[in-house]
Amino acid sequence: YFYAPAKRDVYVQLPQEDYEEGMCGKLGKSMYGTRDAAYNWEVEYVNFMVSNGFKQGKSSPCVFEHPGKDIRAVVYGDDFTLLGSDTALDWFRKTIQDKYAVSIKGRLGPDKGDDKSVRLLNRVIEWTDQGISYEADQRHAEIIIKQLGIDPKHATKNPGTKINPKLFTGNDVEPLKKEQASMYRALAARANYLSQDRSDIRFTVKELCRRM
């Protein structure tokens, strides 16, 4: 975000080492926490990609294609994920390093010098002899289990149990307290996010979120 020029006047308190009575700082670049920082960064990286020959997607502005170098790219926040040949990826690496300070997380591929496992947005992606495997961010499941006080050793064999409406009317269920209701919504939302990568829990989570 710090590479994106500020689009409006934003004033901040000076740090202690630069403090001066009656003075403040005016941002020249965007700063985390300001309302338009994410938008300003989007404008910045789109200009960078387009100026280097990429075409922006129509259905999703976060998807890019470079026709000349046959590169596909997806941008999420400040994470860039690309698909292309070694030559094309080397070109992009030099191009973006000339513009920004970047951290290269890895290059997944079949060749001897390629990485066989990389972490992308806290998902683990591995290249194996059988194909590419994709593991969801396990932290979300661990947080849900911990907050519910569930023993992970006691697993269920099916995603849910159908309730007989004749045996269950809901009258014997006590409403959740305010704090419990907030916790339920938070955990259901977290599980809903996790279910995008965990098809085995998708149905159960959908049912949990229906009347949230």
Language-model-derived ranges and their functions:
Residues 1-212:
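Long, low-complexity, charge-biased intrinsically disordered regions
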